[in-house]
């Protein structure tokens, strides 16, 4: 597989304009990235600009804090799907994970899974806030809840993906779901290391630089 085929070309900043999203979509078409990952308000525009291409439209849910109710997440995900999203990247309720309430975390994931049975569901566990044991448990709970992918990070926390975290999560997943590394994938070497550790998708705002052999200094 080419590096481009791993990449969710991402722009989730609050300052993103419609023109920025159009550029993102044009870059995704040009480089044959797997998907664009954008905020929900831009879904219809991205759908139109990507028409006729193989690039998927991914969006976020409960982002970036995960601190809304499961019902709100389910509604947000369903509306995004109805608007044209192919993939949903949801954030778990991090507070429940830190409190050890894994039943609540799993119920949260299941609520979104039920709301969008046809969409690819990626579950963000926000590794920067978790111990290794919590990362293992969060990964397992996400898979049990119906995740198609478990994702390391929002890119808005205190840290992003690390090779060690990707390797740990991959061991827990054991091939039952995909694994998306996001945040901190800045060079082709970073990308390759994440893939070798077990990542099957990469979230980055610097995909063009990665496939061109350069560096992504954008931070996501």
Curated annotation (Swiss-Prot):
Q: Name one Pfam family in it.
A: DeoC
What is the taxonomic lineage of the source species? Bacteria, Thermotogati, Deinococcota, Deinococci, Deinococcales
Chief place of localization: cytoplasm
Which residues catalyse the reaction?
Answer: 89 (proton donor/acceptor), 151 (schiff-base intermediate with acetaldehyde), 180 (proton donor/acceptor)
Molecular function in Gene Ontology: deoxyribose-phosphate aldolase activity
What the protein does? Catalyzes a reversible aldol reaction between acetaldehyde and D-glyceraldehyde 3-phosphate to generate 2-deoxy-D-ribose 5-phosphate.
Descriptive protein name: Deoxyribose-phosphate aldolase
Q: List, alphabetically, the Gene3D superfamilies matched.
A: Aldolase class I
GO BP of this protein: 2-deoxyribose 1-phosphate catabolic process; carbohydrate catabolic process; deoxyribonucleotide catabolic process
Q: Identify which top EC class this enzyme belongs to.
A: lyase
Catalytic activity entry: 2-deoxy-D-ribose 5-phosphate = D-glyceraldehyde 3-phosphate + acetaldehyde
UniProt entry tagged with the keyword Cytoplasm:
yes
The cellular location(s) given in this protein's UniProt record come to: Cytoplasm
């Amino acid at each position: 597989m080419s590096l481009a085929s791993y990449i969710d070309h991402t722009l989730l900043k609050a300052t993103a304009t419609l023109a920025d999203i159009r550029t993102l979509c044009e870059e995704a078409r040009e480089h044959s990235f797997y998907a664009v990952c954008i905020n929900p308000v831009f879904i219809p525009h991205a759908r139109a600009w990507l028409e006729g291409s193989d690039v998927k439209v991914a969006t976020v849910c409960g982002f970036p804090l995960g601190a809304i109710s499961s019902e709100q997440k389910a509604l947000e995900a369903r509306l995004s799907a109805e608007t044209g999203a192919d993939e949903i990247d949801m954030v778990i309720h991090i507070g429940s994970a830190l409190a050890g309430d894994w039943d609540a975390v799993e119920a949260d994931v299941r609520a979104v899974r039920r709301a969008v049975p046809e969409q690819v569901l990626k579950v963000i566990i926000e590794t920067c806030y978790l111990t290794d044991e919590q990362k293992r448990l969060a990964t397992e709970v996400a898979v049990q809840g119906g995740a198609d992918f478990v994702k390391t990070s929002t890119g808005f926390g205190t840290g992003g993906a690390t090779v060690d975290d990707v390797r740990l999560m991959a061991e827990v997943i054991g091939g039952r779901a995909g694994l998306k590394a996001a945040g901190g994938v800045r060079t082709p070497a970073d990308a390759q290391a994440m893939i070798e550790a077990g990542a099957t998708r990469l979230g980055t705002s610097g995909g063009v630089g990665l496939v061109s052999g350069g560096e992504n200094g954008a931070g996501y």
